[in-house]
Amino acid sequence: MAMPEEINRIACDQMSSILFAPTQTAIENLRKEGFMDIEVRFKYGKERQVFNSGDIMYDNSLYFAKFSGQTKILESNSLQANNYILATIHRDNNTDNPARLESIFRALLHISYEDKIDIILPLHPRTSKLMPKNLSPELYDKVVQSSLLKLIEPVSFLEMIELEKNAKLVITDSGGVQKEAFFFEKPCVILRPETEWVEIVAHGAGVITDA
């Protein structure tokens, strides 16, 4: 399994007696893992219960979206609402693999110039550190000199919400950003070979492209 956080989720599931699932798909996955079987439900001497609670991340995103405009992140980066692309790259299988990182940045440059659109990329410290090492010198120079591909410092939670809700498109390898793009009804390109949030792809709101 490539996603460490998914391993953590499974471990937490196994240790829990009450599970709150965000979707019906998640409940079905628990069923496939045997959580509805009698011997599993009463494994620790008391019934293990599963509830469809809805996704509290959705409530959280909508709540803070009311305040995100206070950040002025769009104005400070000369961005117009619904006229830019938000990108994030931080997963080690992308940042630590020169071929994958090169492919992603070549694609970002191509999209920005072909479509004449700004792409804003808040740089994760991991990505920032590895770009000079894992990008070819020629590509690295093009990236840092590009006027359309805007590399900026990491942003706050509210600033990220503001960038997500006003983007035309989101390109990301982040699980959380995928979901927030979905909540704000933004199409999402997923830079991973798989996603744990299968509902996003099933509803046609995201596409898995890998790198």
Regions found by a protein language model. Give the residues of each.
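A donor-sugar binding/catalytic signature common to diverse glycosyltransferases
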Residues: 1, 19, 160-200
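Donor-nucleotide binding loops and adjacent catalytic segments primarily
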Residues: 67-166
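A conserved, positively charged/aromatic
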Residues: 2-17, 164
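Short acidic-hydrophobic, aromatic-tinged amphipathic segments that line or gate anion-handling sites
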Residues: 21, 51-53, 150-153, 207-211
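Short beta-strand scaffold positions
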Residues: 21, 52, 122, 171-172
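A nucleotide-sugar donor-handling region in carbohydrate enzymes
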Residues: 15-100
